[in-house]
Design a protein with these regions (language model features):
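Hydrophobic/aromatic-lined pockets within catalytic cores
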Residues: 142, 208, 271-275
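AMP-forming adenylation/ATP pyrophosphatase catalytic core
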Residues: 3-9, 13-31, 49-51, 55, ...
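Short, surface-exposed loop/turn segments at secondary-structure junctions
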Residues: 186-190, 213-216, 279-280
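Inter-helical turn/loop segments and adjacent helix faces that build the functional surface
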Residues: 206-218
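Core alpha/beta nucleotide-donor-binding catalytic domains of modification enzymes
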Residues: 1-26, 30-205
Length: 444
């Protein structure tokens, strides 16, 4: 019966193709033993080549060594090559400032990826089952989650496949018993030190006993229905994203034309891009970012790992937090090139008797004039070309919608103590006539 369920899952979700090489994560527990044996039984029918991978996490001492030897021997009996990695997960977790669970997951999938690259393996099979799915759904619901989190564990994500996701733990243990398969028991799975184990050993049995004996089946089937709806909304959000998002920025006016369900998904897509994934990004951050749309320009919030979200002149922007440009002032003579470290740019001043449309700044200037390149100071004013009177630099930046964090990076050209240009905007008193200087500002 279990093999029939697995075969149906493999075909329904197109998890395998003829000729696939599959790496099975083999911990030695009942789930991974069942998965390994089932795929081994089906390898000729599906024309696949199998490998196994085992990680000794360095947490349970002799018990972990026992599991390692079991995984190697079990694989050998089936004629499957087994790869083993020994890792000090507690130390890695400490060094990288993450939980042991997160460190273990990172090490595990990094190991899988390296093996796939080295041995040209194109699929990785993990032993998540229906009970795992129910536990994940309850965990996500209790800690707060998006709709996607209530869809449960996916059958396939990238090259990761989960062939026994529709098989219950009871069915797995019966499969092992019927086929005479031994398996190892992780003692930490029998304790209640971790949230998932409390759900597994206390909450789920209580719900099944007091409310619904088929709760695991019910909740995972409901998750499939939620996923159908969620996939439809995700598609709409993806279309919006392609049309309206540029460099992790979205016009608030465009965003507000969509429904709240689409707004949240669009923001999660932006977070996915800037974080290169969504691990550890709470739905609370999505709500916080969305609230920026109702606030004034210039408001911002700090997100984890050095990311900032801000409302900037009608846009919500996500970007890596930048260090503020420090004050600088550099003297330069005609015919010289200077490097300004605060801008990481080279500035070149040359004499010229003609003006081109090449993006450079052209100013009237004599050879004896004192030229300085600096950034803004309090009280700065200038007389922009095409405008009447004097303009405060602060007002000019606001009019040009130059954000506060970028204003210190705008180069200001000063001649004989007067502002001659702000960026590419020339002061009319220094407008180029018959001859003068050409100023070029290039990346280093």
């Amino acid at each position: 019966m279990v093999l029939d369920i697995i075969k149906k899952t493999l075909r329904e979700y197109n998890l395998l193709n003829n000729g696939d090489s599959v790496l099975v994560g083999l911990s030695g527990g009942a789930d991974s033993v069942c998965l390994t044996h089932a795929l081994w039984s089906l390898k000729d029918e599906f024309d696949i080549k199998l490998y196994t991978a085992h990680i000794n996490h360095g947490i349970r001492g002799e018990e972990a060594k026992r599991d390692e030897l079991f995984a190697e021997n079990f694989s050998k009996k089936l004629g499957i090559e087994c790869f083993v990695l020994n890792a000090d997960i507690p130390q890695i977790a400490k060094d990288t400032n993450v939980s042991e669970e997160t460190a273990g997951r990172n090490v595990r999938y990094n190991f899988f990826n390296k093996l796939c690259e080295k041995y040209y393996i194109n699929k990785v099979a993990t032993a998540h089952n229906r009970n795992d799915n129910a536990e994940t759904l309850l965990m996500n619901f209790m800690r707060g989650s998006t709709t996607n989190g209530l869809c449960g564990i996916p059958y396939v994500r990238g090259n990761i496949i989960r062939p026994i996701l529709n098989v219950s733990r009871d069915e797995i243990e019966k499969y092992c018993s019927d086929n005479g398969l031994e398996y190892m028991t992780d003692s930490t799975n029998l304790t209640e030190d971790y949230t998932r184990n409390k759900i597994r050993h206390t909450l789920l049995p209580y719900i099944q006993k007091e409310f619904n004996t088929s709760f695991i089946k019910t909740v995972t089937e409901n998750a499939c229905l939620i996923k159908d709806d969620s996939d439809y909304l995700d598609g709409i959000a993806e279309d919006f994203y392609k049309q309206h998002i540029r460099n992790c920025a979205v016009n608030i006016e465009d965003l507000n034309k969509t429904d709240s369900a689409i707004k949240r998904r669009v923001l999660r897509l932006m977070l996915r891009d800037i974080y290169n994934g969504l691990n550890d990004i709470s739905s609370t951050y999505v709500a916080d970012i969305l609230s920026l749309a109702d606030k004034s320009s210039g408001r911002q919030i700090n997100l984890p790992y050095g990311i900032v979200a801000k409302n900037e002149y009608g846009k919500i922007i996500l970007e890596h937090k930048k260090e503020e440009t420090q004050p600088f002032e550099v003297s330069i003579n005609i015919g010289e090139t200077v490097f300004i470290s605060e801008l990481d740019k080279k500035v070149t001043v040359s004499e010229t008797d003609m003006r081109n449309k090449d993006g450079a700044v052209y100013l009237s200037c004599d050879k004896t004039d004192k030229i300085i390149v600096r950034n803004r100071r309090n009280g700065d004013k200038f007389q922009p070309m095409g405008m009447n009177g004097t303009k405060k630099l602060k007002e000019y930046f606001i009019d040009k919608k130059i954000s506060k964090d970028k204003r210190n990076s705008v180069p200001i050209i000063e001649i004989n103590g007067e502002i001659a240009a702000v960026g590419n905007r020339i002061d009319k008193r220094f407008a180029f006539k018959d001859k003068g200087i050409k100023i070029e500002c290039d990346d280093n």
